[in-house]
């Protein structure tokens, strides 16, 4: 118990020393001490959101994705068809270079 109180006491002494050195050090300490708190709050929010979200929404998303994939496959099959005729037309339209 003494080690823990000594640890926090040393941190408090460091904070007071840096505060006396200037406002810039106080702002830096505030940011550095606030970042872990922000991370903990964010993780807590994400965990609560995942645990409390309705299970119905999770089950519906893959079904929609399957339908979209099927539609994309059909479109991709149509897009993969290559005709030789347009290439011939393009070559005929290209002007010949004078020699």
Swiss-Prot record:
Record field: compositional bias (Basic residues): 65-74
Principal subcellular localisation of the protein:
membrane
User: Keyword Membrane on this protein?
Assistant: yes
Q: Name one GO cellular component term.
A: membrane
Provide the alphabetized UniProt keywords. Answer: Membrane, Transmembrane, Transmembrane helix
What is the membrane topology listed in the Swiss-Prot or TrEMBL record?
A: Single-pass membrane protein
- Entry protein name: Uncharacterized protein KIAA0040
Region Disordered, residue ranges: 54-81
Q: Which stretches are transmembrane?
A: 27-47
Query: According to its UniProt record, where is this protein located?
Result: Membrane
């Amino acid at each position: 118990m003494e080690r823990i109180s000594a640890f926090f006491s040393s941190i408090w002494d460091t904070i007071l020393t840096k505060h006396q050195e200037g406002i810039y050090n106080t702002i830096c300490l505030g940011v550095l001490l606030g970042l872990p708190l922000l991370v903990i709050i964010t993780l807590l929010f994400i965990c609560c959101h995942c645990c409390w979200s309705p299970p119905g929404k999770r089950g519906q998303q893959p079904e929609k994705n399957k339908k979209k994939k099927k539609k994309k496959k059909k479109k991709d099959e149509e897009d993969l068809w290559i005709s030789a005729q347009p290439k011939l037309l393009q070559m005929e339209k290209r002007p010949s270079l004078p020699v």
